[in-house]
Amino acid sequence: NEQSGKSQTVIVGSWGAKVS
Protein backbone atom coordinates (compact mmCIF):
# COMPACT_ATOMS: atom_id res chain seq x y z
CA ASN A 1 0.00 0.00 0.00
CA GLU A 2 2.75 2.42 0.91
CA GLN A 3 4.60 1.72 -2.34
CA SER A 4 1.41 2.26 -4.35
CA GLY A 5 0.81 5.60 -2.68
CA LYS A 6 4.33 6.77 -3.44
CA SER A 7 4.01 5.70 -7.09
CA GLN A 8 0.70 7.51 -7.38
CA THR A 9 2.25 10.67 -5.96
CA VAL A 10 5.01 10.60 -8.59
CA ILE A 11 2.49 10.09 -11.39
CA VAL A 12 0.17 12.82 -10.15
CA GLY A 13 3.10 15.19 -9.68
CA SER A 14 1.84 16.47 -6.31
CA TRP A 15 4.54 15.45 -3.85
CA GLY A 16 2.39 16.46 -0.86
CA ALA A 17 -1.26 16.29 -1.83
CA LYS A 18 -1.16 12.51 -2.06
CA VAL A 19 1.32 12.05 0.78
CA SER A 20 -0.70 14.35 3.00
Swiss-Prot record:
Region annotation (Disordered) ranges: 1-20
Keywords: IgA-binding protein, Lectin
Disulfide linkage: none
Compositional bias ranges of the Polar residues kind: 1-11
Record-level Gene Ontology MF annotations: carbohydrate binding; IgA binding
Function statement: D-galactose-specific lectin, binds the T-antigen structure Gal-beta1,3-GalNAc (Thomsen-Friedenreich-antigen-specific lectin). Potent and selective stimulant of distinct T- and B-cell functions. Shows a unique ability to specifically recognize IgA-1 from human serum.
Self-association state and partner proteins as the record states: Tetramer of four alpha chains associated with two or four beta chains.
Family in the record: Belongs to the jacalin lectin family.
Protein name, UniProt field: Agglutinin beta-1 chain
